[in-house]
Amino acid sequence: MSKTFNIYCDESTHMMHDGHPYMLLSYTSIAYPKIRKAKDAIKAIKERHNYTEEFKWTNVHQATYKVYADLIDWFFMNDLEFRAIIIDKSEIDESRKDYTYNDFYYKMYYQLLHQKVNSENTYNVYLDIKDTCSSAKLARLKKIMENNSSIRTLQFIRSHESVFVQLADVFMGAINYNLRLEKGDVQGTMKAKLSLIEKIKKHSNISLNSSTLLSRRKFNLFFISLK
């Protein structure tokens, strides 16, 4: 029996010259009939902690730790999925003929979505609006995904409108921060962020620095090697 899922995409440090070593593209996925209940549960978490801001990795600090800890616990106890693609930008070779950074970016979005979309189901895909190029970006993504008949909707959404986009931002931030810690790019003095990273590692039973099996659905990571 066919099911409908909503996929909420986000991206982090994806610009070519933003000073960050990794590009991350990700999504949070949830079955359409479960959206209302999930929204209500997340709203209750925010109210319990008197938290009124968007969920963002940049908003994680000691005073907000408990609400983020509850959010992560809730995710792993409920029927949602997270997937991320991670690329070391230093490995991207723009010297290849007819190949640009933007070409690579869209190919990675294709990999993010195509590998986990089941032809037996239908999907509504929402992408976080990032910049003034959003319209052109959407048109190109639609062109790339046009042969995938399972995708019913592909449109933009603003992050403040979707707690599921915000959830993807938190997980990406944790993955990125963990990688930069290992690389020595950050000192790791933010105890709240370190504690959340350890919580995610414990729940997912992975290190956050290597690929998981494609069949692993709850928390799926794909580190793309271009060497």
Model regions and ranges:
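Phosphate-ester processing/binding pockets and catalytic centers
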Residues: 1-227
